[in-house]
């Protein structure tokens, strides 16, 4: 019997709030480079192929050859907003094709886990479970989710200097 919520169906031209957190609520972004790497992978997956060039690098800084370049989802996913917190992330997207989100999220999270595990010399899963999604059905919900994603870091602002997370209305274009 399949796990609850293990089979997900998403429609084309739908808006979705996607989120996930670290297993045991662990930190999934340990330093600024981790945030930048996750954002870099999103940018690479969502940029037109002619803009990607040969920019993808592994954790040691070596360029990944074109034969190993990632899939591209620029015609399947439109990024609306995102927020990366120390132990979780939120991504708000418009899915253009029927299967874009599932492939995009699988590619993004697998590549980030590979980077993270190599960098921190660990093995195993990084995320608590498969990502969760909420379909945004109307303008009120759209506004609420956008505000929620951008206010999320304000809830845990530190008393001193230092990053609490990264968030933006799609600045990856």
What kind of region is each of these model predictions?
Residues 1-172:
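Short catalytic/metal-binding and nucleic-acid-binding patches
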């Amino acid at each position: 019997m399949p796990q609850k919520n293990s089979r997900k169906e998403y429609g084309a031209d739908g808006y979705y709030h996607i989120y996930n957190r670290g297993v045991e609520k662990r930190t999934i972004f340990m330093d600024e480079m981790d945030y930048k790497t996750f954002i870099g992978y999103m940018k690479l997956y969502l940029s037109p192929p002619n803009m990607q060039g040969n920019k993808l690098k592994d954790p040691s800084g070596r360029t990944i050859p074109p034969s190993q370049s990632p899939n591209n989802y620029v015609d399947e996913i439109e990024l609306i907003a995102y927020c990366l917190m120390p132990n979780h992330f939120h991504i708000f997207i418009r899915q253009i094709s029927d299967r874009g989100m599932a492939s995009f999220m699988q590619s993004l999270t697998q590549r980030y886990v590979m980077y993270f595990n190599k960098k921190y010399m660990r093995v195993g899963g990084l995320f608590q479970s498969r990502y969760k999604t909420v379909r945004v059905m109307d303008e009120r919900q759209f506004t609420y989710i956008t505000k929620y994603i951008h206010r999320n870091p304000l809830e845990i602002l530190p008393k001193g200097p230092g990053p609490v997370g990264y968030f933006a209305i799609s600045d990856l274009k």
